[in-house]
Amino acid sequence: MFVKVCGLSTRESVRAAVESGADAVGFVLTKSPREISPDRARDLLVHVPEGVPAVGVFRHEAAADAVVTAREAGLEWVQLHGSRSPEDVKTVHDAGMQVIRAVTMGAAPVEFETWGEDLLLIDAAVPGSGETWDYSSVRKLGLGARHWLLAGGLNPSNVGAAALEAEAWGVDVSSGVESSRGVKDLDLVRAFVQAAKA
């Protein structure tokens, strides 16, 4: 199971994620309680081993602006939330970066078609709410062997069952490993990765 831990903002949380076996880490570079500056993300990259993707997360920024900010942070992956188009994915790829395109289960089915993204992230209808949802509903999309991440309401207690229900290739977590909004609990980070990979 591929595991991405998102919304990291401290050296300790990055190390807890990668040392417990996370396959990717995410830095929020958009307005959020988890937002960090590009300079801070660059500082945290020192603690991310080679081969572990570090992803810059963006919500409403234009794809070209996201590329500039990600480059400033030293990142090679961009995660795009919000209303997007295939041209946004192309813009990021043309810059030599890889793309995670985030969509919600409340969105029109056409958005689940491939736009050439490297990974698809499927979230709850209200991203960032931390609320659980009907994970099994993803199966009707017929994603097959496509590489995609399940997100929304996941935590160490439910990630195993949720991933099985959705037949997920990977999982993504942020609020489900926090002691308070925007503050990662290192024990929960470790427990989540362990549970997802069990």
Which residue stretches match the model-derived regions?
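Conserved N-terminal beta1-alpha1 strand-loop-helix module at the mouth
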Residues: M1-A198
